[in-house]
Amino acid sequence: MRYLFVGDTHGPTDLGKLRSPEVAALKLGARDAIIHCGDFGAPWRQDMDEVLGFWRQVPAKVLICLGNHENYGWIMRQPVTRRYGCQGYDLGGKLFAPLPGQTATLGGRRFWFYPGGFSIDFFLRQTGVDLFGDELLTGEQAAAVMADYFRRQVPDYIISHDAPRSFILKHFGFPIRLPPDAYYAHTGERTGSRAHPAFTLDPIYLARRYNKWYFGHHHKDYEAENLRCLYRQMVLEDSLTGETRIISPAG
C-alpha cells in the first residue's frame, strides 16, 4: 500500500500540488491512501463547492487530520462512522476525518490523529462563517486524548495539523503562545477553555514517544528528528517496499 502525505491545501488555494503532473504520474488508486495534515478547507463558507467535488472523485482513500481553516459548521453535521478501525466523519466519497485521538490502521500501519490549530488571524475572521471555536479541542477533550495516548502502544505515525511547541521553538525559532483573551471574546468561548495543540502535543515530543510524525500548519517544508512539516512538498511511502520519495511539483 502507498501513502501520500500532504500538507495544507486551503480549499483551492494550494490544491495545485494535487493536480500536478507529478501526482498524476503516481496513478494512485483504491489500494492507496492520501493522508492530509489539515487546512483541507473544503467546502468553504457553504455546504458544497468545486473543491469538495474534486476530492470526492479521488480514487484513493483520503484521511484528513482537520486543521483550523475548516468549515466546522458543516463538518460537524456530517455522519460519524467507523472506518479503518476508528471513528470519524464521513465527508462523502472516500473522504474520512478521524476524530481526535483515533488510530486508523491502513496497510498494517497505525496512524494516530490529533486535529486542530489556532487561527492567529482570528480578528480578520467572522465567527461561525470562517472561524470556529471547534478548531481547538476543549481542555477536557485534550486531556482525555493525551491520557489515552500515553496508555497505548506508540503508533507508527502521528498525524497532526500543528506541531509540538518545543520543536517549533527549536527548529523554527517561533515562540508559540496561548490564545489571548481577545480570541475568546471574538469566538464567544470561555477564556482559557480551549487547548492549543502545540502545548498539548509537547509531552509526546519531549518524551520521544513517537516513531514518525507528519504535520502542516506552518507553511514550510522541513524535516528533523523524525518530524516532517509539509507544505509544497509531499511524501510518498510504500508499505511493501519501504521506499520513501519526496514529491516536489514544479512551479
Regions found by a protein language model. Name each.
Residues 61-65, 84-90, 167-251:
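Conserved beta-sheet core of the metallophosphoesterase superfamily
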Residues 6, 12-106, 178, 184-185, ...:
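Core catalytic region of metal-dependent phosphoesterases/phosphodiesterases
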Residues 15-16, 45-47, 74-77, 162, ...:
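A short acidic (Asp/Glu
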Residues 1-4, 102-113, 157, 224-229:
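Beta-strand-turn-beta hairpins that frame and shape the catalytic cleft
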Residues 9-10, 40-41, 68-71, 117-118, ...:
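Catalytic metal-binding/acid-base residues of hydrolase active sites
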Residues 3-5, 33-37, 113, 157-161, ...:
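Structural motif
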Residues 107-196:
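Active-site-proximal loop/helix segment associated with metal-binding centers of metalloenzymes
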